[in-house]
Amino acid sequence: SNVYGPRQDPHGEAGVMSIFTGKLMNNETPTIYGDGKQTRDYVYVLDVVDALIKSSETDDNLFLNIGTGVETSVNELVSILSQKISWDGEPEYAPKREGELLRSVLNNERAMSQIGWEPKYTLDTGLDELISWFSK
């Protein structure tokens, strides 16, 4: 999964949530590599912290997927962020990066059943938190 949330550097190579949020809030055009149909499982950082705490409370050595189980395309992400930030431009498209996965989504059923974890933040609420942090 792709973890996102406040304090993530918007100027790096990774962290598309922060990169896009930073650009859109500065009225800059985000660059999408490839056609934007590639999907990711975006999980809010506090959900990951919650999963780590719950997993530390067991003596079992567990291998768990921590994600939302929801696929969101890069195009969808830019569209949602654009609406939330009231940015009315169009993203720039660049050639896809070599080796990039087309789809990435995690099945979190074992985390739910073995440590009682499930994500509390939806993409919508997580993005609201991220935008709020960027606005400060």
Regions found by a protein language model. Give the residues of each.
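Short, solvent-exposed loop/turn segments at secondary-structure boundaries
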Residues: 7-12
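C-terminal substrate-binding subdomain of Rossmann-fold SDR/epimerase-dehydratase oxidoreductases
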Residues: 2-6, 22-136
